[in-house]
Each structure stands twice: as C-alpha cells, then as structure tokens.
Amino acid sequence: MTRFVLFISCFFLIGMIVECKDGYLVGNDGCKYNCLTRPGHYCANECSRVKGKDGYCYAWMACYCYNMPNWVKTWSRATNKCGKRK
C-alpha cells in the first residue's frame, strides 16, 4: 500500500513539473492565426502541427491551442507586435 501511495505521489509530482502551454498561435508577423474563413478543423490541425493536443477557433476568430510545448510562440498582450512596424 505504501508503494502505491508513493507511486501516485510521484505521478502527480511529475505532472506538476511537466507543464504545458496554452494560448493563441502566433505567425511570423506577430499576429494570431486567423480562423474566420477557415474550415472547422483548421485550428486543431495547426495546433497538432506544433505538437499541441487540441485547438479550436476562439471567439476572437483566432486559433487557441492546448498543451503545447514551451518553445511554441504564443500571443501576449505585453509582447504584441501585430500591425506594428519593426
């Protein structure tokens, strides 16, 4: 029984350490991926392309992805460069 509790504790600890990223996908121009005129599965495909688990077209008409690796660039209000000149 003690080993089982120890195993479950380690499992949850690993789950807390290996965090995944959620957010809006960002293109090279710094803008969110637009999905207004795309087919319904477009965002899910784009999210899986960057190793995300799932994605959908959010109310802002942009692709939102779940459980992506930390190296994937996501949109942030603080670092927003969309529509701004370089």
From Swiss-Prot:
Positions bearing Cysteine amide: C82
InterPro entries xrefs: LCN-type_CS_alpha_beta_dom, Scorpion_toxin-like, Scorpion_toxin-like_sf, Scorpion_toxinL, Scorpion_toxinL/defensin
GO cellular component, one term: extracellular region
Molecular function terms from GO: sodium channel inhibitor activity; toxin activity
Tissues with expression: Expressed by the venom gland.
TM ranges: none
SUPFAM superfamilies named among the record's database cross-references: Scorpion toxin-like
Keywords for this protein: Amidation, Disulfide bond, Ion channel impairing toxin, Neurotoxin, Secreted, Signal, Toxin, Voltage-gated sodium channel impairing toxin
GO terms classed as biological process: defense response
PROSITE patterns, A to Z: LCN_CSAB
SMART domains: Knot1
Family label: Belongs to the long (4 C-C) scorpion toxin superfamily. Sodium channel inhibitor family. Beta subfamily.
Domains: entry comment: Has the structural arrangement of an alpha-helix connected to antiparallel beta-sheets by disulfide bonds (CS-alpha/beta).
Task performed by this protein: Beta toxins bind voltage-independently at site-4 of sodium channels (Nav) and shift the voltage of activation toward more negative potentials thereby affecting sodium channel activation and promoting spontaneous and repetitive firing.
Protein name in the entry: Toxin To11
